[in-house]
């Protein structure tokens, strides 16, 4: 594994914790890969990632979703993980059974790296970001290998099959 370092104000090398992100991209910068990169950077980490989907949305609704071919996502992830390595892998929007399955197979190659599984299912505007048939694939393939699962309350309702009371 290569070290990811920069020099601090005193010209000393600073080592970063490396987080590899596998998530969707959206134009607002308030969710997905863009938001994850900001969050990791704000915590002093080094973020790298592979885009799973390109989402066309505005503040009102999701207009279209384009999925990146699974093999391209896996290739990008392997290029980084085998060369640089990661201290953590975080997933975001995976959208389909094919993506969930492909990413699960990839993550199984890196059993020793902690995994944050964010089951992105519903946009902040309430639009579906995960095909219904992919919910079970998350439960069967990704959740068992997760170090932590981070659903929001809407996603928790989908996973539980019942309303969740937020107080």
Labelled PLM ranges:
Residues 1-6:
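Short, small-residue-biased leader/transition segments that mark boundaries at the very start
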Residues 7-88:
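Small-residue (G/A/S/T)-rich helix-start motifs and N-terminal tracts that mark the onset
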Residues 22-25, 30-31, 51, 91-93, ...:
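Fold-independent oxyanion-binding glycine-rich loops
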Residues 48, 52, 114-119, 142-154:
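Non-cysteine beta-strand/loop elements that form the S-adenosyl-L-methionine
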Residues 55-63, 123-128, 156-160:
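A short acidic, helix-capping loop that chelates divalent metal ions and anchors anionic groups
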Residues 64-72, 130-134, 164-166:
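Alpha-helix N-cap and loop-to-helix initiation/capping positions
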Residues 81-141:
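Glycine/small-residue-rich loop that forms an oxyanion/phosphate-binding "nest" at active or ligand-binding sites
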Residues 132-167:
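Conserved phosphate/ATP/ADP-binding segment of small-molecule kinases
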């Amino acid at each position: 594994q290569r070290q990811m370092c920069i020099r601090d104000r005193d010209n000393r090398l600073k080592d970063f914790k490396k987080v590899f992100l596998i998530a969707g991209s959206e134009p607002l910068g308030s969710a997905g890969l863009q938001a994850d990169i900001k969050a990791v950077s704000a915590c002093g980490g080094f973020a790298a990632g592979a885009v799973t989907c390109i989402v066309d949305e505005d503040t009102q609704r999701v207009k279209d979703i384009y999925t990146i071919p699974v093999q391209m996502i896996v290739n990008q992830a392997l290029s980084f993980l085998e060369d640089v390595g990661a201290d953590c892998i975080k997933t975001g929007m995976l959208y389909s059974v094919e993506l969930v399955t492909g990413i699960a197979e990839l993550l199984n190659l890196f059993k020793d790296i902690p995994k944050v599984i964010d089951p992105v299912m519903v946009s902040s505007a309430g639009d579906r970001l995960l095909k219904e048939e992919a919910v079970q694939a998350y439960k069967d393939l990704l959740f068992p290998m997760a170090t932590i699962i981070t659903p929001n309350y809407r996603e928790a309702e989908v996973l539980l099959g019942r309303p969740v009371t937020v107080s």
